[in-house]
UniProtKB/Swiss-Prot annotation:
Disulfide bonds: none
Effect of residue 92 to D: In strain: EFB1
Protein's name in the database: Exopolysaccharide II synthesis transcriptional activator ExpG
SUPFAM superfamilies per record: Winged helix' DNA-binding domain
Recorded name of the encoding gene: expG
Species this chain originates from: Rhizobium meliloti (strain 1021) (Ensifer meliloti)
Amino acid sequence: MERGMNHRILYPFADFGDTVAILPANETQRKGLDTPVDDRDGDDSLVTYFELARVMERASRRFSGLLRAELTKLGVEDIGPAQAMVLLAIGEAELSVGELLDRGHYVGSNISYYLKQLADGDYIDRIASQRDKRSARIRLSEKGRQLCAGLRQAAKGYERALSHGDQDRRNLETAFQTLHRLELVWGNAARYGI
């Protein structure tokens, strides 16, 4: 890996041992490697699914910390990052609890707790269903909309810092698509096996 980023700078505490660098096809030909990169055994890959899952978990924790810091900057002390993500999942929609569960892939007991906190803090409005008085629809209150707007504004700053052109935006889109595909595959594997 003569060109490109130094992985020791990006991952200073990682031990890559004897890992194989995955090079683009034109790099493979220049280096004289006989085996195409895509045909190599899965054990030789630079990243395993477990390593990817660990990075995703760390990124999730870092994002949660960042979200907590943004909530503090906005003067919000009564809810945490998980509840803020529920507000963002609701967005401009009016949803039933079941629809919110599907949209955010939440656990039922967690969402009930989050919704109670959000209702107690006046971040959401609960509207009783006309057809079934036992069920309710949920939407953001004005306070919830203002908080979401503040969080979206803060997110734009991070997006500008991360995106320096079309290639960065395409890379972000590719990363999103890949992570979404992994979510679907892993979810189906957990439910139905492979």
